[in-house]
């Protein structure tokens, strides 16, 4: 009995359809790739479900995808005999976008067609790509294991709504009929579709078939023998073997790239990939891709990530995150294991020796891919770093075993060059360390400019000692977990003493000690004047051109960490900076000569707030600072 209902599309679907039709118009043939890919996935899912319920095959275990055209009607039909859908599944999957972060996706759209088409590709348009070429789409489907009277028909013109009806469908699976727009009738041509299938779907592991017309009989002549008539039949247009099961030497670059687009639904080619078959104690095949562009929702906590899992070439699940650490969540690909049970679940994967061993192996494989890229193609590695560098910086906190390898892959700016681009590795830095230098000096600031121009670098610049410049939000978090590299301690130039060690000669040490002794009275006066505003006042070991600076004491939170915690709404323990003065600077020398205690207090406070402004980029009470500045300027004008 017919049960026709009309449903409105979810708002986001309407937006996506409108955007897609306009942004993907120049790449419209991808509709076939997306629909064939979905049909192949439906076959994979049936094959997996049938492992425990063979009756789902309904006597038809030859899984395939069939594509046909009708030039007169102007239609293209994509039909599979896979898992099929129930009425509820149809409404859920063909009327809504069940993705977290959808609102953020729409915010990221810029109006630039080429950029937006990339974003839409990353988002994954799937079934909705039908409307790029069709002004009406009809879907007929029946779920495996359900009766023929439980078929479902879905139909829409891709505007505001769609209808759903109950129909009789004898065969299981899904049939999608595209009623082509007048200007897209070129796609109702077998030859055109064959070329697209060959281009996009050669790697699909089920046969993608088209109808091959029969040929009439040819009678014998003096020139040639008789030829018997042939019947029309469905012919496979693709190799129909799982690409990763083939030898690497038999797979072309183009096939690897198209397979990446199939599993990732990305429109752009991958940056690099690695295809490996491992035999021995463990038996598995991995095909791992590093994309060329970061996904739009990479920082969304709810975003699904992970590898496709196959067991003995049978698809088991998408997004198996157990095989890839979070800091490598951008990696796409699959793993096909011979050692896991076919009925494996996410729960079983969670605490499984085979899973742990596979995760260890593929993690090392990806790090090896990146190390090789960094060594052999620095420019291409910079492309990778620009997209995924901040994610990789999560690694040292997450992966203690591979911390040193991850650290070797990190890139930063440094005082070695004027360029703000992060091109310097820690190995580069170590190779340039001066004789007697035992530490890797670094600074974390709000921006590259703030780091490069920080007064804390003055003495180190004068001595020609390189400093790593860090200015990304994650850097303070990173540095709390990356304390050394290649046996060299990482040391902040804004914390405690500089600890130059052998880089400071005996004459410099003697001069510093003499200056500290001569300045004891001034240091005490400033401390008494500032009181509880600072934890201590001392003569600087790092300034040459600036009158004063503030530094964090050893074991205390840095300015950047305080900012991170405040931004996250966390309580921050109260801390007071150490105030360092440069007695050789004219302003501090003038302060030393000031006999008026009120003026002395004002000057001390002004120098402290200047130092805090330079370090933090802001003040707790900017109005008080401006008032103090104005008072002192007026006093000078009188």
Curated annotation (Swiss-Prot):
Function field: Molecular chaperone. Has ATPase activity.
SMART domains: HATPase_c
HAMAP family attached to this UniProt entry: HSP90
A: annotated span: 1-346
Gene Ontology CC terms: cytoplasm
Ranges where the record places region C: 564-638
UniProt xrefs under InterPro entries: HATPase_C_sf, Heat_shock_protein_90_CS, HSP90_C, Hsp90_fam, Hsp90_N, Ribosomal_Su5_D2-typ_SF
Protein name: Chaperone protein HtpG
Localization per record: Cytoplasm
Annotated region (B), positions in chain: 347-563
Domain of life: Bacteria
Chloroplast is among the record's keywords: no
GO molecular function: ATP binding; ATP hydrolysis activity; ATP-dependent protein folding chaperone; unfolded protein binding
Keyword Cytoplasm: yes
UniProt keyword terms in alphabetical order: ATP-binding, Chaperone, Cytoplasm, Nucleotide-binding, Stress response
Membership in a protein family: Belongs to the heat shock protein 90 family.
């Amino acid at each position: 009995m017919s049960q026709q209902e009309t449903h409105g599309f979810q708002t986001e679907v309407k937006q996506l359809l409108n955007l897609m039709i306009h942004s993907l118009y120049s790449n419209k043939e991808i509709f076939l790739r997306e629909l064939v890919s979905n049909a192949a996935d439906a076959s994979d899912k049936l094959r997996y479900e049938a492992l425990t319920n063979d009756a789902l095959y309904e006597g038809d275990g030859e899984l395939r995808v069939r594509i046909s055209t009708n030039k007169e009607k102007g239609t293209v039909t994509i039909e599979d005999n896979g898992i099929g859908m129930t009425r509820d599944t149809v409404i859920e999957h063909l009327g809504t976008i069940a993705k977290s972060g959808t609102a953020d996706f729409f915010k990221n759209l810029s109006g630039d067609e080429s950029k937006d088409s990339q974003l839409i590709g990353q988002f994954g348009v799937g079934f909705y790509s039908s409307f790029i070429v069709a002004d009406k789409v009809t879907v007929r489907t029946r779920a495996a294991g359900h009766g023929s009277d439980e078929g479902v028909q879905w139909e829409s013109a891709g505007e505001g709504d769609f209808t759903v009806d109950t129909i009789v469908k004898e065969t299981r699976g899904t049939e999608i009929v595209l009623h082509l727009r007048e200007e897209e009738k070129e796609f109702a041509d077998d030859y055109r579709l064959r070329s697209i299938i060959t281009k996009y779907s050669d790697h699909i592991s089920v046969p993608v078939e088209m109808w091959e017309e029969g040929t009439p009989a040819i009678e014998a002549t003096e020139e040639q023998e008789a030829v018997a008539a042939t019947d029309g039949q469905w012919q496979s247009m693709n190799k129909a073997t799982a690409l990763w099961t083939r030898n690497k030497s038999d797979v072309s670059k183009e096939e690897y790239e198209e397979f990446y687009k199939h599993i990732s639904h990305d429109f752009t080619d991958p940056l690099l990939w690695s295809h490996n078959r491992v035999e021995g104690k463990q038996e598995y095949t991995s095909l791992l891709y590093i994309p060329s562009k970061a996904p739009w929702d990479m920082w969304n906590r709810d975003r699904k990530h992970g590898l496709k899992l196959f067991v003995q070439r049978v698809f088991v699940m998408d997004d198996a995150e157990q095989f890839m650490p979070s800091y490598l969540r951008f990696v796409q690909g699959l793993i096909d294991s011979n050692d896991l049970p076919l009925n494996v679940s996410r729960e079983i994967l969670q605490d499984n020796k085979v899973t742990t061993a596979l995760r260890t192996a593929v993690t090392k494989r990806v790090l090896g891919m990146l190390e090789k890229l960094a060594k052999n193609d620095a420019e291409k590695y910079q492309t990778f770093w620009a997209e995924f560098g901040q994610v990789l910086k999560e690694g040292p906190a997450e992966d203690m075993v591979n911390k040193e390898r991850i650290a070797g892959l990190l890139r930063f700016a440094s005082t070695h060059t004027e360029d703000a681009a992060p091109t310097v590795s820690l190995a580069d830095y170590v190779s340039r360390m001066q004789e007697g230098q035992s530490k890797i000096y670094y600074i974390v600031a709000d921006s590259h400019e703030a780091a490069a121009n920080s007064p804390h670098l003055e003495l180190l610049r004068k001595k020609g000692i390189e400093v790593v410049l860090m200015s990304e939000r994650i850097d303070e978090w990173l540095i709390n977990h990356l304390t050394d590299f290649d046996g060299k301690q990482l040391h902040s130039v804004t914390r405690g003493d500089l600890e130059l060690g052998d880089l400071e000669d005996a004459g410099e040490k003697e001069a510093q000690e003499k200056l500290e002794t001569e300045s004891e009275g001034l240091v005490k006066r400033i401390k008494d004047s500032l009181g509880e505003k600072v934890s201590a006042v001392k003569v600087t070991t790092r300034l040459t051109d600036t009158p004063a600076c503030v530094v964090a004491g050893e074991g205390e939170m840095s300015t950047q960490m305080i900012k991170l915690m405040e931004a996250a709404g966390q309580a921050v323990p109260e801390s007071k900076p150490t105030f360092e003065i440069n007695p050789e600077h004219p302003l501090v020398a003038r302060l030393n000569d000031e006999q008026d205690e009120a003026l002395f207090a004002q000057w001390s406070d002004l120098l402290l707030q200047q130092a805090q402004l330079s370090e933090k980029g802001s003040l707790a009470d900017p109005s008080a600072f401006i008032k103090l500045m104005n008072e002192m300027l007026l006093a000078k004008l009188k």
